[in-house]
Amino acid sequence: MIASPDFVPLTPDEYLKHEAQSLEKHEYRDGDVYAMAGAMDEHVTIAGNLFAELRQFLRGSGCRVYISDMKARVESINRFFYPDVMVTCDPQDQETAAYKRFPKLIVEVLSESTEAYDRGDKFADYRQLESLQEYVLVSAKRK
């Protein structure tokens, strides 16, 4: 998303309200909102397969698995992301339906347009989550 000269940063609450009504997904970084591109077939298939395997593996554990329509909130640095797959086991995450604050696992399926960001700035942002134990990057190129 290209910011206009008249752009006014959004508060997290304004972002969540806008996102609930939007037809497309946006990431939020300290007041700035960025539209996300749609994913390709291979990307969606990999994320879906990981979701299905993790859901089956974690059944009955109290953990929940979410796919790319659930936001992860990094509250300490004022960020919202849409991970491809996310696992949370913290009961506090059941208090909010629009986002999760305590993921243990985040998986990103790499694409050419996002790989550098997923490995760099986004990873640095995710490291601010005290609950995060694993950050997994999956290449759609390798077989």
Where are these regions (language model features)?
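Gly/Pro/Ser/Thr-rich low-complexity, intrinsically disordered segments predominantly at protein N-termini
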Residues: 1-143
